[in-house]
From Swiss-Prot:
Protein name, UniProt field: Coiled-coil domain-containing protein 66
Region (Mediates localization to cilia, centrosomes and spindle microtubules and the interaction with PCM1, CEP290, CEP104 and CSPP1): 570-948
GO BP annotation list: cell division; ciliary transition zone assembly; cilium assembly; detection of light stimulus involved in visual perception; establishment of mitotic spindle orientation; microtubule bundle formation; microtubule cytoskeleton organization involved in mitosis; microtubule nucleation
Phosphothreonine PTM sites in chain numbering: 115, 121
Phosphoserine found at: 369, 606
Length: 948
């Protein structure tokens, strides 16, 4: 172990000078880095900003020509494929170089968000120190300078310059040098996505591609020349480094050109020495034998670095791109592509082999989860060792960073030295062995079972199989039933279709038969109607001839000259034959028209139902034909004979359209034919009504809307006038009977009548009845005379039975008694006359009938049994009664109607008094009963209400 191994140092600025101090582990510097731009401030602190673990891997010489041997180290991670690439680190001798690297780190961190291809780059730091060696500014090599470069585009560089200029002055070429350094360093980190076996020519070409932007068209030569100048300037002003600002080393331009030229010459000399050293290192690397077969990859990497150094050297020459170099570049590119393809194939094969083994271990771990598989654990570590060649680390700090990245991304393993890999894998194996030594009482999934459990499993399996069989049997049974039901349903549907087809055919046949029968009936009807018309014509002709002959004979008997009539008779017979033929033809035509009209009416009714519109022309044709036929028939009949006979025939034809008298004369043989003829005539009359209606209403009615042309007439007005009158009188009489029954059943009626005179009672009663009959009086066209009586009378005559015999008899003295119809007429006429005379409506009281043959008329001059009053209405009624005549003297002899005929007045008064007392007693008894029943009814109502 060398001095300084394992120490973590940290730089600190004290009084403007940089000093190294020991820093504890897990310590992070709190020095905030402030940029010149106020808008862009570095927010993410660096993890290994200033602390570095120093590890010396080779003894160094203090001489100015001797340099430290550089060893590669791999500490990069890949997010996508898990591929690793080696990054070269070179050791420096100066502490001031660490400050330069820190500045590069800060610039790199600032630029990394702006370059998306560089997001996962690693911060590379040159950290090797020589123990107890003082810093030498003159021994800064080109490798040391260019290992900390960053590749930037011109736009990014201009943006950084503008941000710095906002806080400071314009940047000098030193800042450009810094940017170029950071650019180159980031480029080395950005090649991590490429395989490790690519040669240095590919790197050189990609360096050209990155550095030569199409917009700028800068060459690699200018980049490296500019870089060398910047490094010299930085070294020159390094003693004047100020801690206040990290850009303080970048901001000032060297004014002394002579010193710059001297520095440039010294720089070229050091580059030549570096080229010679690289050649020696290449020879040494070829002789190495790596036990993990890393010699090939190491060789490739050393070749890359050698060619890179050579390219850097040739960049400084005057002719960097000669034809020979281009040929070499082409060959190297071809070789590099071939190596890349071989490496890719080898990786694919390794992945396939590893995936097979991993699958087997995974399944074994699944079934025997308690067993430990150390091979599978170690395989995860061997994956990282066998995948890619790896390099020695400069310090464990970079290894720690790689381990952290491997923890974050499990698919990528960190590349460490073989000794360290064994050191990491060993404790894991120990943990696995310790876990396997523990006693496990749990039975794994593939462990053996006892016979009881095996039998139980077999029994369960058998049950499950039986259950599945039962389920399948049920499913099959359901499917079979469903299939049978489907077949049955289809069969029923087919039978139903056949049945419907048969019914349809039968209906069609029946319809055709009905049509044939209808046609036959129509033909028979037309034949019979023709025969009927012919017989009617012959009968008419015969009747006319007979009448003419009878008239001639009568005139001859009276002595008149009948020669002209006989002559006319002969002419008339010829004309009658001609007219008969015309009439027969017209009748035949009318039959045809009637047949057409029947079919037309049927069609129109059907069309009316379906709402199909017909033409006006058809109706006009038929109505014209019908009117023409009717006029032709009338004209023929009028021209048959003489004017007298023709007038008689016209009267017969007009009044008796159905020819029933002629059929009665002919006999019963023509009754059926007359009925058929009547049907035909009714059809013609119907058509005539339609034509009249069309004439009245020329506008056709709306379709499917039955608008009645006549006003609504109630059924009661359709009766004859006499019947209407009788119905109204019956209605009034019924109302009067109901009114008397109500008054008769009223208990206070008789008691009220005692103190009221019969005239007042009579007048009030007449007023109530006159209101009921007033509508009948209005309907009378003329008032009937009181003395006009009907000749027909019923044998029974009414006798007034008065409810209150003491009062009602005097009220009804002036009313005549007759049969029902005559009584109603007299009542109406009496009420009309009293209305005309006095203006006060009065009507007779209801009088029931008694079995007697006489009609009694009371004497108006007879004294009244009650107190007399001077009622003008009663006097008017007496005047009306005086005008009446007595038909029979027996009416005066009646003691009930005529009080003058009463011989024993005392007896009559005693009878009336007894009746009044009896009535009063009955009324008193009724009141007592009502008063006794009222509390009982109230108690019952209360009990009934309380029950609810």
């Amino acid at each position: 172990m060398n001095l300084g191994d394992g120490l973590k140092l940290e730089t600190e600025l004290l009084d403007g000078k940089t000093k190294l101090i020991l820093s504890p582990y897990e310590h992070k510097s709190k020095i905030s880095v402030k940029m010149g731009n106020k808008a862009k401030i570095a927010k993410c602190p660096l993890r290994t900003k200033t602390g570095h673990i120093l590890k010396s891997t080779q003894d160094t010489c203090i001489g100015s020509e001797k340099l430290l041997q550089k060893k590669p180290v791999g500490s990069e991670t890949s997010q996508a494929k898990g591929e690793k690439n080696g990054m070269t680190f070179s050791s420096t001798k100066d502490l001031c170089k660490q400050c330069i690297d820190k500045d590069c780190l800060h610039i790199q961190k600032e630029i990394s968000p702006a370059t998306p291809n560089m997001q996962k780059t690693r911060n590379t730091v040159n950290t090797s120190l020589v123990g107890k060696q003082k810093p030498h500014k003159k021994h800064i090599t080109a490798e040391n300078m260019k290992s900390s470069l960053v590749c930037l585009t011109q736009d990014q560089l201009q943006q950084i310059l503008m941000t710095v200029n906002q806080g400071n002055r314009s940047l000098s070429l030193t800042e450009n040098g810094k940017e170029a350094k950071s650019q180159y360093s980031l480029y080395l980190n950005s090649i991590s996505n490429q395989p490790k076996d690519e040669n240095i020519m590919g790197l050189f070409k990609k360096t050209e591609m990155v550095s030569s932007v199409p917009a700028e068209n800068k060459s690699v030569l200018n980049e490296h020349q500019e870089t060398s100048k910047q490094c010299e300037q930085k070294i020159a002003i390094e003693n004047e480094w100020k801690p206040a600002d990290i850009f303080s080393t970048l901001g000032e331009r060297e004014c002394d050109r002579s010193s710059l030229e001297a520095k440039k010459a010294q720089w070229r000399k050091e580059l030549d020495e570096q080229v010679a050293l690289k050649k020696k290192e290449k020879e040494v690397s070829e002789k190495w034998n790596d036990p993990w077969k890393k010699s090939e990859s190491d060789k490739i990497i050393w070749e890359k670095h050698q060619i890179l150094d050579q390219s850097r050297e040739t960049v400084l020459l005057e002719h960097p791109f000669s034809a020979v170099k281009q040929e070499l570049q082409r060959k190297w590119i071809e070789e590099l592509n071939k190596q890349i393809e071989d490496d890719r194939q080898r990786k694919i094969e390794e992945k396939i082999i590893y995936s097979k083994g991993e699958e087997h271990d995974r399944w074994a771990m699944h079934f025997d989860s308690l067993k430990s598989y150390p091979g599978s654990q170690s395989q995860l570590f061997s994956q990282s060792t066998h995948k890619q060649p790896e390099y020695f680390c400069v310090s464990p700090d970079t290894q720690e960073l790689a381990d952290v990245s491997s923890v974050c991304t499990p698919t990528t393993g960190s590349q460490v030295e073989p000794s360290e890999e064994e050191h990491i894998a060993k404790p894991i194996k120990d943990v696995v062995m310790a876990n396997s030594k523990k006693t496990n009482f749990l039975r794994s999934m593939t462990a053996l079972l006892d016979p009881a459990q095996i039998e139980e499993r077999d029994r369960r399996r058998q049950k499950q199989l039986e259950h599945q069989k039962a389920i399948t049997a049920q499913v099959e049974e359901k499917r079979r039933k469903k299939q049978l039901e489907e077949e049955q349903r289809k069969k029923e549907e087919q039978e139903e279709e056949l049945r419907l087809a048969q019914e349809r055919e039968e209906m069609q046949k029946q319809y055709e038969e009905d049509i044939l029968k209808q046609k036959q009936k129509e033909e028979i009807m037309t034949l019979k109607t023709n025969e009927l018309f012919q017989t009617m014509q012959r009968a008419q002709e015969l009747a006319q001839r007979l009448k003419q002959e009878q008239r001639i004979r009568e005139l001859a008997q009276k002595g008149h000259d009948t020669s002209r009539l006989i002559k006319n008779l002969g002419v008339d017979t010829i004309q009658m034959e001609y007219n008969a033929s015309n009439i027969s033809n017209s009748r035949h035509d009318s039959d045809e028209i009637s047949g057409k009209m029947n079919t037309y009416m049927n069609s129109t009714t059907s069309k009316k139902d379906t709402g199909v519109q017909t033409d006006d022309l058809n109706i006009g044709i038929f109505t014209n034909a019908e009117s023409h036929c009717g006029s032709l028939m009338e004209r023929d009949i009028t021209n048959c004979s003489s004017p007298e006979i023709s007038a008689e025939l016209i009267g017969q034809f007009s009044t008796k359209k159905n020819k029933q008298e002629l059929t009665q004369d002919k006999g019963a043989s023509l009754e059926k034919e007359n009925n058929r003829c009547n049907d035909q005539c009714n059809q013609f009359t119907r058509i005539e009504k339609q034509t009249k209606h069309m004439k009245k209403y020329p506008k056709r009615p709306d379709w499917n809307i039955n608008k009645p042309p006549k006003r609504y007439i109630p059924a009661s007005e359709k009766y004859p006038k006499q019947l209407q009158k009788q119905r109204e009188e019956k209605k009034v009489r019924r109302q009067m009977e109901l009114l008397h029954l109500v008054e008769k059943n009223n208990p206070g009626h008789l008691s009220q009548n005692r103190g009221i005179s019969p005239e007042i009672f009579h007048s009030s009663h007449q007023e109530t009845e006159s209101k009921l009959r007033w509508h009948l009086v209005k309907k009378e066209e003329e008032p009937l005379n009181i003395h006009s009586f009907s000749k027909e009378r019923s044998p029974s005559s009414p006798v007034p039975v008065v409810k209150n015999r003491t009062q009602q008899t005097q009220n009804t003295l002036h009313l005549p008694l007759k049969n029902s119809s005559y009584e109603r007429e007299n009542l109406i006429s009496g009420s009309n006359q009293t209305e005309l005379s006095s203006g006060i409506s009065e009507s007779s009281h209801f009088i029931p009938y008694v079995r007697t043959n006489e009609i009694y008329y009371l004497d108006p001059d007879a004294p009244l049994s009650g107190p007399s009053t001077q009622d003008p209405q009663y006097q008017n009624s007496q005047d009306c009664g005086q005008k009446r005549q007595l038909f029979d003297s027996d009416c005066v002899r009646d003691p009930l109607l005529n009080p003058n005929m009463v011989k024993n007045r005392d007896r009559q008064q005693a009878i009336l008094k007894g009746l009044s007392e009896l009535r009063q007693g009955l009324l008193q008894k009724q009141k007592e009963l009502e008063s006794s029943l009222l509390p009982l009814a109230e108690n019952q109502e209360e009990s009934f209400g309380s029950s609810f």
